[in-house]
Amino acid sequence: MKLAAMIKKMCPSDSELSIPAKNCYRMVILGSSKVGKTAIVSRFLTGRFEDAYTPTIEDFHRKFYSIRGEVYQLDILDTSGNHPFPAMRRLSILTGDVFILVFSLDNRDSFEEVQRLKQQILDTKSCLKNKTKENVDVPLVICGNKGDRDFYREVEQREIEQLVGDDPQRCAYFEISAKKNSSLDQMFRALFAMAKLPSEMSPDLHRKVSVQYCDVLHKKALRNKKLLRAGSGGGGDHGDAFGILAPFARRPSVHSDLMYIREKTSVSSQAKDKERCVIS
C-alpha cells in the first residue's frame, strides 16, 4: 500500500479502519497510585509533562502509525493504581501485548506492588492456550520513576536486578524521570524491540501528525506520488513514518476485548505453527 493511500486510510474521518490483527497491539501501564503512570503516557503521546496530579480510574488512548508500507494500531491503557475491580485488572492483563510496570524510587510499597504485578501477569498469561509459566513470552519493562528524587531512594539496586532476572529478551529495567524526560525514549525503543514491533513506534522516531493535518498530508503524499512516477523524486517523504493520535478513543467493550484475545491467540498460534514447519 502506497503512503498516500495509507495516510487517507488512517484519517479518523474515513470509514471504520480495517487493520489486520497482526498489526494491532495494546500497551498496558500498571503500577501503584502516584508513581507517574499517566505522566509516562503523556510523554509518549504528546511529549508534555503535567505536574498536577489527577487520580486515574482508567484512561484509554489509540494511536495509528504508517510505517514502511503498513498501518499499525497501538492501544494504550493507563490503569488505575487502586484496582477496585480485580476482574477488570485481569482482563486488562489478558488483552495486553506489551507491559510497562512503574514504581517510584522513593516509595518502597510501590516497588513491592510491581513485584506482585509481574507475577500476576505471568500467572494470567499462562492461562492462554498452550502456555505455561515457564514459556510465557511477555514483552515487559519495569520503570523506576522519579529518578530526579534519587536522594530519597528506598529501593536497592540488587532488589531490582533480582526482580528483572537475567533474560533481557523477556524483561528490562530503566530508571527514568517523566518530569525531566530522562531515559524514556530508550525505554520505549527497548520495549518495542522486545515485542518485535517497528522501532518507529517510539515517540522520537516518527512524525506526529494532527487529525486536522490529514487532508493536507494526503494531498502532499499524492503530489509526491506523481513526482515519483515522473522520475522527479518526492522529497523523501514516501519513506517517513507517521503517527496519528485518534481523538475521543473509547475503551472497547468486554465482548470486544474477549474477541480481541481470541483473535490474537489464534494469530500467535498460527505463527508458532509456521515456525515449527521445516522442509528438509
Swiss-Prot record:
Record PTM S-nitrosocysteine, positions in chain: C11
GO MF annotation list: G-protein beta-subunit binding; GTP binding; GTPase activity
Matches recorded under SMART domains: RAB, RAN, RAS, RHO
Name of the protein in question: Dexamethasone-induced Ras-related protein 1
Lipoprotein is among the record's keywords: yes
Tissue: Prominently found in brain at both mRNA and protein levels. Moderate expression in testis and lung. Slightly expressed in heart, spleen, skeletal muscle, liver and kidney.
Family statement: Belongs to the small GTPase superfamily. RasD family.
GO biological process, one term: signal transduction
Keywords: Cell membrane, Cytoplasm, GTP-binding, Lipoprotein, Membrane, Methylation, Nucleotide-binding, Nucleus, Prenylation, S-nitrosylation
Lipid-modified sites (S-farnesyl cysteine): C277
Annotated motif Effector region, positions: 53-61
Propiece span(s): 278-280
Annotated residues for binding of GTP: 31-38, 78-82, 145-148
Stored CDD domains: Rhes_like
Modified sites of kind Cysteine methyl ester: C277
Role played: Small GTPase. Negatively regulates the transcription regulation activity of the APBB1/FE65-APP complex via its interaction with APBB1/FE65.
Quaternary structure and partners: Forms a ternary complex with CAPON and NOS1. Component of a complex, at least composed of APBB1, RASD1/DEXRAS1 and APP. Interacts with APBB1/FE65. Forms.
Subcellular location: Cell membrane; Cytoplasm, Perinuclear region; Nucleus
Membrane topology: Lipid-anchor
Xref: PANTHER family: DEXAMETHASONE-INDUCED RAS-RELATED PROTEIN 1, MIP08469P
PTM statement from Swiss-Prot or TrEMBL: S-nitrosylation stimulates guanine-nucleotide exchange activity.
Top-level lineage group: Eukaryota
Any one GO CC term of the record: plasma membrane
Natural source organism: Rattus norvegicus
Gene3D superfamilies (alphabetical): P-loop containing nucleotide triphosphate hydrolases
Plastid recorded as keyword: no
